[in-house]
Amino acid sequence: MDPEACPCPTGGSCTCSDSCKCEGCTCASSKKSCCPAECEKCAKDCVCKGGEGAEAEEKKCGCCQ
C-alpha cells in the first residue's frame, strides 16, 4: 500500500515493512499515513514531525507529501 494512501484512524500505533502500514495510528488527519520516527526509513513519503520516539507515536506524528 502506498504510504500516502494509508488510512490513519486515531488511538493506536503504526508499523512499517516494505511500505507504511497504519494500524490505529493517532494523528491529525485520516487522509494521510502516520508513522513513528523509527518508521521514517521505510515510509518513503511519510515524515514524522513535532516529536520523537514515544512522543511522536503518541499524538504528534504527521505526514507530509
Swiss-Prot record:
Binding site for a divalent metal cation 4: C42, C46
Entry annotated with the keyword Nucleotidyltransferase: no
Binding residues annotated for a divalent metal cation 6, in chain numbering: C35, C39, C42, C64
Binding residues for a divalent metal cation 1: C6, C8, C22, C25
Binding annotation for a divalent metal cation 7: C48, C61, C63, C64
Any one GO CC term of the record: perinuclear region of cytoplasm
Region of interest: Alpha: 31-65
Residues the entry annotates as binding a divalent metal cation 2: C8, C14, C16, C27
GO MF, one example: copper ion binding
Keywords: Acetylation, Copper, Metal-binding, Metal-thiolate cluster, Phosphoprotein, Zinc
Function: Binds heavy metals. Contains five zinc and one copper atoms per polypeptide chain and only a negligible amount of cadmium.
Protein name as it appears in the record: Metallothionein-3
Source organism of this protein record: Ovis aries
Top-level taxonomy: Eukaryota, Metazoa, Chordata, Craniata, Vertebrata
Gene responsible for this protein: MT3
